[in-house]
């Protein structure tokens, strides 16, 4: 049996902004200790809450609330804008620490990752070491969920916060997981939860005691199968490391809340930028280029949609990948038959790069061009030398026989 960790940064965006402020000014107010949120502008009251402090949570403020409604609940609320440059910096530092323990790390979003801790010693002691190193070195806290598969590890890390370690092994599922509301099952969104509750399925335990056929009749084939397996604690234990992928490079992230038509403009670009930079970094690390870029989404009803395009020239540059991905997702979500015409929210976004080459054609083209240029120079030089000799000979003939002795030839 494997040992899988799910490690999740507590209120990541808010924590990282707080740490940055304290690093710049040790006497600054720690945003984590007062009612505060990340998202939008307090003056205009525009934007969506993307992260909140524990004191803010006590006012009933939730992720994905509008800033206006959050301020109504807490008039003294501190609102700060998102700072994705800082988030990327701390995310890289967070993952670097995890990879110092094992290379079996799968980053699933900017602030969370799975780690295969099989055969790495006592799981609780290891989790304590990792948690303490992140707190002492980087200044923020994490939750660690421990189980034998990814779903249960994720569920465990979502138990009480912050700075906690929780286990949820299969034998603990009836006591720890089944009493929870069905909406707290990882991957069960608001609309799915509402559908299930209309059929009397209110807890995860209720779903676990419902047949696959009934669940599929309510949610469809894929949605029903997911809830059937998830409610029983069944999930993959495979941690996908970056170097295992050979024929394509892709990164995807499960969002902290759904992206909808209302918050699309405010939030999608930052998600795509982060994913594009991840894909670009991996391509460059392996020295390869991609000619096809694709974007994938998963809706809050478990449907996956994707779109791709072929580039004129292969690339591994983040800016071009981001620009291409932005155009693709606009078409996928907002186009004539876009996802948002039938779906209300996106819970997962991915960016991929395929149709790879290692740059040999680029190098060959460069070398061929250089060779052609050198050959052209030599040919031009030889032609000039030949003309100089002919001109010198002509001058001699003219000097001996007169100017009319030689004239230019022409073709008819």
Where are the language model's segments positioned?
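Gly/Gly-Pro- and Ser/Thr-rich, intrinsically disordered tail segments characteristic of DNA damage-repair
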Residues: 1-229, 281, 374-412
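Acidic, metal-coordinating catalytic segment for phosphate/diphosphate chemistry
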Residues: 16, 311-412
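Short Gly/Ser/Thr- and Asp/Glu-enriched loop/turn motifs at secondary-structure junctions
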Residues: 108-112, 147-150, 244, 288-292, ...
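Short, internal active-site loops enriched in acidic
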Residues: 119-121, 149-153, 233, 298-302, ...
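DNA-contacting surface of Y-family translesion DNA polymerases
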Residues: 184, 194-343, 361
